[in-house]
Every structure is written in C-alpha cells, then in structure tokens.
Amino acid sequence: MPQMKLFGNSRSAARVAGRRKAEPENEPKEKKQKKKKPLKVLAIWLTVILCLEGLYFFLCYTQNSFVKRWRTIYIQTAMSTMRHQWMATYLLPEPVIDEVLQMRIQAAEAVGDKESSWSKEPETTTPAEPVEPAIKPIDTTVTEMETETMTPEDEQALAKEAFYEMFWELDQATMEAYVEQNPSVLDNGWENININEAGLDDNGTSIMTTMGEQVLAINAKEEIMLVRVEGSGYRGILAIAKDPARLNVENSSGVGQFGQLTGTIAQAHNGILATTCSGFIDIDSQGNWGNGNGGLIAGYAMSNGHGYGTHYVSNPNFQYYRLEIHTDNLIYIKKVDKEVSEDCRDATEFQPPIIIDGEVLQNDYWVELNPRVCIGQSDKYEMLLLVIEGRLYTEGILGTDVNECAKILQRHNAVKAMNVDGGTSAMMWYDGEYVIRGSNSATRYTGSRPVPNAFVYHKVEE
C-alpha cells in the first residue's frame, strides 16, 4: 500500500521545518524593537512641548500687528473685570501686562483736561409760547374759510410731514411699505404711531434707517425710536430719545442700601425707557467682591438736583470723568476733579469719554471687548442711549470696544458721548419689557443685576 505524502517531498518538508525553527530566533529581535517605542513617544512629546513653548513666547512677545492687537484686547478685557483678571495674570508674563496697561495710561493722559462745551445756543427743546401777530386789516371771513377748508386728509398730510421731520433717520420707502402691510398702525394717525417689535422674542420690523439699521420700535407720541446695531462679535440697541428734557438719572428706592432692577426703577418713575447708569461698589456685607446688592454708588451721581456718593479719584490707571446734564438739557463732560456745575440737574461718573465737541477720542488702547452702555447727544440735541450685549460666548457675541461705540454714535451725529457702567450690569428696558440680554446666564432674561440708579426717559405727561 503506497504511503501518503504530507509535504510533497523531503526538501519542502525541510524548508518548512527550517522556517519553524527560525521563528523563535526572531522573537528576541521583536522585543528589542518594542523597547525603542517609548523613546520615540518621548521624543514626539518633547517636540510638541517645545513647539507649544515657542508658540507661547511668540504670542507673548511678537510685534506682529495682528497678534499684538488681539493680545492687547485679551489683556485689557481680562484686567477690566473684577473676577477674571487671573486670565491675564496667570497666563501672561507681568512685563507684557504692564506694557499694555502703561499704553492705556498714556492714552488716558492724551485726553488730558478736555472739557466739553456748546458753541452756540441750543434750539429750544419745548414749544415756545405763540407770538401774538400784529393786527392787520385782513378779511376775517377769508381766514375762517381757509381754516374750514382743512380736510382730515390735509391734517394727516401735515402730521405725516412732522413725523418724518422728527424721525429724520427713517428710510421712507421701507416705512411706507410697512404701513401698507400693516395699515392698522395709522388707526390713530401719524402723530400717534406706536410700533413695538423690540422684545426678546420679537424679530424687529422691516423698517430700516438710512444708516442701514433695523428699526425695532417707534413711538411718535413719546418721541422715541429703537434701532438694532450689530457687527463683528456684538449686537445691541440704540435708543434715540428726541426730547432731552425728559431724560433724568433716577435712583432705586433703596439707594445707599440696596439696588433695584433697571425696569423697576423706570416703572417707579413713570418711564418708558431706561438703561444702566452709575457703577456700584460690588461687595457684600461679608466682604466678598462680586456679590454686591447694587445699593452703593461708585463715584458721584446727581438725580434731579440732589447729589449722591463720593467723587472718584483719578489715578494713572483710570482717569475718571463726569457726565453732567444741565438745566438747558444739554450734556457736558469734564474730569471728576472739576467742580460740579451750579446748573447741573443730573450726573454720573465713569470713563472713558469717547466724543467731546464732535471729536472722537479714538485710540488703540481702549479695546477690551465687553458689554457696553454709552450715553451721548446729537447735534439735534437728541439723547442717544446705546447698550451692547456681550459675553454670550456660545453665540459668538463677545461685546465690543468703546471705539466701535463711537462709530455707532457718530452715525447719528453725536457731538458728546461717554462710556458708563456696563459689564454684567448692562441693560435696557423699554415699554414694560427688557430688550437686552444680560451677560450673566442666571439673570439673562430677567433684567440682569440690581443697580443704584438708571437713566430714565419719562413718558409724556397727560
């Protein structure tokens, strides 16, 4: 019986056996190669660390204009807060931080003792008493006929003309289109138009300004308009209050002891609009910073002729200024070491001033990105109240710098403007609701933090 060949022949069997014997000899070599891997990993990590260290030194010390600008923004944004200065001091070398702060000091010194003034008498902000005309031999019958021939259409034409004269910023084509789509807005005539789509759940109107801004609200009777302002990394609202005589600083009911929400202050003083005004000493009874109740005014303020608080003392890091509203209903800006004017009726202190007598005090060192509140006055004597949202990081809304605020206000012909307390306190309330989101997630939709006072634009007295 023939035998079965398992390996073909003896040579092939020998080769297979040889390979099997050779395999164990290769195993020690493989083990030696594995011992070399930790060295490679270590080398990779060292390379990564060296690259990161090189990047760190590049970001800290390079004079590249793009990197330097954002480094300055980062440092100033962190150092302008109470709670987050560690983001600069812990991560960046002290000399780098000091250099940025020194440049800020130089920028403040450049403003110097500039003090605002008005070069001409303002137009009267309230209707003058009618002047009795000289008696002339005229046909009174004809005069009566002219009055009687004024039709309702003629009256509305005059009211429409007055409306567009007051709200000169409006793009008339978009306003007319809105009225055509929403004819009910004219139910009470042009003089009583009241459009409000400024709420946090609203999307605004289709009306635009000639500056390209979306209109959120118009109230002809109250002489006020709200427009959306937005740009790279920020959004907010500019309120244009046409009658400066109706804007005052109003206090919380517990000023000196506790603050109130902006809207609460407005409602207590018959206001239709309110924004943040003075800063406050943000410390609680246990001495914990960042937990104040908003009652203690930081700096000096005046409300309806009565002064409160203690004047700021300027230092090299912060040059403080006072914004005064005088009895002529005009804004004046001066350094805090100047005497309060005798005819001042309302005031607040903060920094920096951003427009004095039409000159924009723009520079490269007031560039921190924060929620903002600014107040200004146009060459038509309108009060301009600007609030910018910020620190909404998931939406890419960081806030903006005072230079951008100056550009927004300048579009509306501001000749005076100053930055006031913003940050987590930045808020605007209009006609019964908050129209700005706060930067604190816990109070984002409910009015943010209690404050000692607010700029309040009062309703027309019936």
Regions found by a protein language model. Give the residues of each.
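Gly/Ser/Thr/Pro-rich low-complexity, intrinsically disordered segments
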Residues: P2-E462
